[in-house]
C-alpha cells in the first residue's frame, strides 16, 4: 500500500464508547469488507448487547514494529458491571468458556461510529478477542464509588487494524435494528 495524502476532518470529536456487542466468533458466519469498511455481516443474533456501567467501556488499540517490516496490532476492551449477582456469573462463565475459540466485538465509539474488533482484513477471524482478565471487589466502606464492581478485559493481537462499519450498517447498529445483534429490550 502506497502512502497517500491525509485530510484532517474539522468536526466535533466525542470521547468514550456508547455500546458493546460481543459474539462467539463461530456464530458470525460471513463478514464482507468493501473499501476498508465492514459492508455485510451474517449470523442471526450472533452479537449480544452487553449493558455495562455508564462510561465504563474503553477500547484501546495500538501497533508496534515487529522485525524489519512487520507490525502487530493490539486491541484491549475494558468494561465494568456493578453489583455482582447470578446473571453476572453467567456472563463470566460464558466469556471464560468461549475464550479458547474467541470473540468478535462491535464497539460503538462516542462519535456513534461502530467498529468490528477481533477481526482484521489480514487475519480474518483467526486472531479473535479472548478474555484477558476479570476481577471484582466489594470495597470496604459504603462510600467507595468503585465497590461491588466486576471489571472485564477482552484482548487480542493481530496483523491488522480493526475495521469500521459502513454508513448503512452503522445506521442499523445505532438504530437498534441490525439483524445480527440481540439487543436488550
Predicted regions span which residues?
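Composition- and surface-driven signal marking solvent-exposed, interaction-prone regions
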Residues: 92-94, 168-169
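Mixed-charge, glycine-accented linear interaction segment located at domain edges/termini
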Residues: 124-185
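A general structural signal for short secondary-structure junctions and capping/turn motifs
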Residues: 68-70, 94-97, 107, 142-146
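Generic "edge-of-domain/loop-turn" microfeature
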Residues: 27, 38, 84-86, 112, ...
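Solvent-exposed edge beta-strands and adjacent loop segments
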Residues: 2-78, 126-144
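Short, acidic/charged, Gly/Pro-enriched secondary-structure junctions
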Residues: 93-121
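Oligomerization/assembly interface segments of phage tail-like spikes and tubes
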Residues: 64-89, 145-160
Amino acid at each position: 500500500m502506497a502512502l497517500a495524502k491525509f485530510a484532517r476532518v474539522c468536526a466535533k470529536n466525542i470521547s468514550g464508547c456508547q455500546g458493546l456487542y460481543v459474539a462467539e466468533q463461530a456464530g458470525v458466519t460471513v463478514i464482507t469488507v468493501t473499501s476498508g469498511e465492514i459492508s455485510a455481516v451474517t449470523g442471526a443474533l450472533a452479537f449480544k448487547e452487553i449493558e455495562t456501567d455508564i462510561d465504563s467501556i474503553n477500547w484501546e488499540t495500538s501497533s508496534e514494529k515487529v522485525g524489519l517490516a512487520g507490525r502487530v496490532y493490539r486491541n484491549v476492551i475494558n468494561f465494568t458491571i456493578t453489583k455482582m449477582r447470578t446473571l453476572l456469573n453467567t456472563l463470566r462463565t460464558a466469556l471464560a468458556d468461549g475464550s479458547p475459540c474467541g470473540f468478535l466485538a462491535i464497539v460503538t465509539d462516542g462519535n456513534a461510529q461502530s467498529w468490528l474488533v477481533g477481526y482484521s482484513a489480514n487475519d480474518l477471524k483467526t486472531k479473535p478477542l479472548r478474555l484477558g482478565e476479570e476481577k471484582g471487589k466489594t470495597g470496604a466502606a459504603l462510600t467507595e464509588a468503585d465497590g461491588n464492581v466486576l471489571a472485564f478485559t477482552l484482548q487480542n493481537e493481530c496483523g491488522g487494524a480493526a475495521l469500521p462499519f459502513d454508513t448503512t450498517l452503522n445506521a442499523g447498529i445505532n438504530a437498534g435494528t441490525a439483524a445480527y445483534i440481540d439487543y436488550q429490550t
